[in-house]
Amino acid sequence: MPREEVYGTGKQSIRYAAKVDLTRPAAEQPYLHNRWHPDIPFAGTIKNGETVKIECVDWTGGQIKNTDDADDVKNVDLTKVHYLTGPFEIETAEPGDVLVVDIQDVQPLEDHLWGFTGIFDKENGGGFLDEIYPKAAKAIWDFEGIYCSSRHIPGVRFAGLIHPGILGCAPSAEILATWNRREAELIESCSHMSRVVALPPLEQSAHAGSADATIKAKVAKEGARTVPGRPEHGGNCDIKNLSRGSKVYLPVHVKGAKFSVGDLHFSQGDGEISFCGAIEMPGVITINFKVMKDGMKQLGMKSPIYVPGPVEPQFGPGRYIYFEGFSVDEHGKQHYMDASVAYRQTSLRAIEYLRRYGYDDYQSYLLLGCAPIQGHVAGIVDIPNACTTLGLPIDIFDFDISVEKPAEKKDRGSCAFASDNPGAKA
């Protein structure tokens, strides 16, 4: 559809800077790309001070379906992700400036009122707890206005804190080279480890928008993968609080900024622990763009800054159950100030707690990735243990999970598993 389409009929009509087609493969759409590279052509131009709507596909490009098995999650092609909309030229933006991204609204597409949460198979993506829960699983969520619920995790309903997982401007050629060098060094230094520690450039499945064959080949060879966030530009930070009313301040490294956005989430818990842990969806985001000239120098900016908006689910400070975790792993081994070990233990304590009500562990793992849980680093100085906490909202359940109330265990159904692994239920 033409990018000139506008929304509304009054003086403040908002145009679409880009629209997507969910019936068409993501790799064939010129407004999308799945690598970071300064040479990817502009998908459109946005004026300094302009507000626009930008449509996005889900981060996998439509690979996950509304079904009751997790075959699609198990076999997802992760060489294709993330599909982002952009990059956009922001008029007057130059290296050294700061791009002010004012998120005015985020919504699902009207003809796609559902999303998904997944646990990747340990052999294809894995996740935060994949040594304990190695099998693929999935939950489908239906949207009802601001609320969501899932047939795969019954007894739960909550308002979404809808947000983009990825916001970023293109790296310069020098910054891209820095990324590739330092991540290659990490891969080499961790070659003895049994897990993937970083993803180097990969030519397979690279999509460079409307680039010609020469530029596409260069992007495929050099382009940075979109999986990690990086300090120089933000990117895939998966910060659940970047919802309506938020402002994000992004460093600009190339002329025109080359801003991209994607990986929209209906809801997410702090940490997005199952990797595909948010409620993933295609959707539309409304953004106002302003350029802060020479902003990087003014702010002494070395990484993005954000101010959260005033919109979030209101449970109240007394309506959470908090679980604690420390740098002692599930085997009893002591680690030194390891917040990742601590947060794994925090997550496991919450999963064990929900087991008492009849949820299987995979259902709870999925839920902790996408529900509006509060994750915090409580202590990071008391050697040898970091202490982390996870706050589970009591009111997302349609039954009482209060600590002092005896737990009533019931059949809570099942999430979706891969068809060749029906016995994955914990």
Regions found by a protein language model. Give the residues of each.
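N-terminal, Lys/Arg-enriched amphipathic/low-complexity engagement segments
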Residues: P2-V76
